[in-house]
């Protein structure tokens, strides 16, 4: 059936859940306003995006094409989006859907849409 199949805790606070429906599995991170203090508009999204270095590559394992980012390069911009250390024992992993990534992309898109509207005289 549908519903929450797992709840993730940090100390005594719920920080996430895994929920399922008939057609989807969702990994949810807590985002309720009641858990947050000092809320403010996000600034610096342009610099965040400009610091990222999108790349293409060929995977060594099978020669297939890849597109995205190099984890240790992203770690310099967004440490919370990357797990592990450059040249560490374990290969690094990156969360492409991190809240920091999505929030900065949306903030910059909103800024650009506002600028286009101003330039178009709307």
Predicted regions and their residues:
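C-terminal intramolecular chaperone/autoprocessing and neck/assembly modules of extracellular spikes
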Residues: 3, 7-101, 108, 112-122
